Every structure is written in C-alpha cells, then in structure tokens.
Swiss-Prot record:
Its main location: cytoplasm. Component of the 30S ribosomal translation pre-initiation complex which assembles on the 30S ribosome in the order IF-2 and IF-3, IF-1 and N-formylmethionyl-tRNA(fMet); mRNA recruitment can occur at any time during PIC assembly. Residues 1-72 form the S1-like domain. This is Translation initiation factor IF-1. Pfam families: eIF-1a. The keyword Aminoacyl-tRNA synthetase does not apply.
Amino acid sequence: MAKDDVIEVDGIVKEALPNAMFRVELENGHVVLCHIAGKMRMHYIKILPGDKVKVELTPYSLDKGRITFRYK
C-alpha cells in the first residue's frame, strides 16, 4: 500500500489495552482501535490515556489504525 493512501487524523487516547493496543477517540467522535507504529516502539515512546496522538487509518478499514506520533 502506498504511503499517500492513508488518512491522518488526530485523537485522544481513551484506554490502554493489552499487547500495546489503544482505544483512541478521534476529533470527529469515532472510537478506533490502534496499535503503535514500529518506530515509536523502537524508541520506547510511552503512550498513556489522555495523550493527544496522530493516527493513520487505511481507506479499507476505518475502525483500526496506527499511532504514528504523540504530541507534547
């Protein structure tokens, strides 16, 4: 899949789940199940409930996503 096929939206982490999964509420009100991108996992970036994050969604599955950035 090409990089320009993704949809990037901001959201707030609502819940931390097992296996580095998170429930994120997007700006438009939808709740998405997300995992952490590999680069964030490699650099030990911690994500806690309440953090504002950037999420990538694919056009094929809008209920799952990947957290690519945590805002300060």
